[in-house]
Amino acid sequence: MSLENFFDANYHVACTMQRGIHKDNEMKEMLSFSEKDSALVHSWMKDYGLFQGITSEDRKAIVDRYLSTIHVITEQHDTIDNNCIERMFTMMMTEFYNVVPRKWLSATSKLLWCSFPDNVVIYDAFVERAIMILQGITPYLADFPRIQTSPAVRNMNDIAKCAKFYINYQDMVKAILNEHQHQLDKLRIETSETYPHDIRIVDKLLWMLGNPNQAFTLNNVICKPA
């Protein structure tokens, strides 16, 4: 069995889950029109669990900082390459850290994805877990630096380390996407799938693989949590 088999068996479920996240589309639309909807951003971040352990006052401050800086951070980029992504990631995480000093890895990646939904990879610890195993059995992933646990962010100097970690992480997710692009194109046609962002479909499939509480299908067997 291989990752290709896993993708075949779980593609429809992954896409269904992604289509069900309606606020993603609202966030993308808000940004495309340069609008500022603090209630939407707050609700979206809460739904993704990005406010855990943060006071109501700090939540509002983070939303305000995001809305006041996102268009400055993301404007005037002709090519969304790694240098550009790392620069935007560092800028946004720095803005958030200045408001509430904690690791904003997941929030930064997810919010940047809303601006560049076909170019930016979101970070998730379950995906990291899946990649950690896949790297040892997948030759093209072994070409990348060994993925490690995301670094702690205890001061401003650690933000650069976190950005470097994220770039290596997203490089591997994109490598998996590139390796399976033909398969994903075929599955999209066969299932008449309308969810548009393959990069998030791959993320969801890896999330299913790395999440011990998520059921999946393989070789006509449904594997459920004990």
Regions found by a protein language model. Give the residues of each.
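An N-terminal alpha-helical hairpin/helix-loop-helix interaction module that forms a charged
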Residues: 1-100, 117-226
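Short hydrophobic alpha-helical segments that form membrane-spanning helices or hydrophobic packing faces
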Residues: 107-113
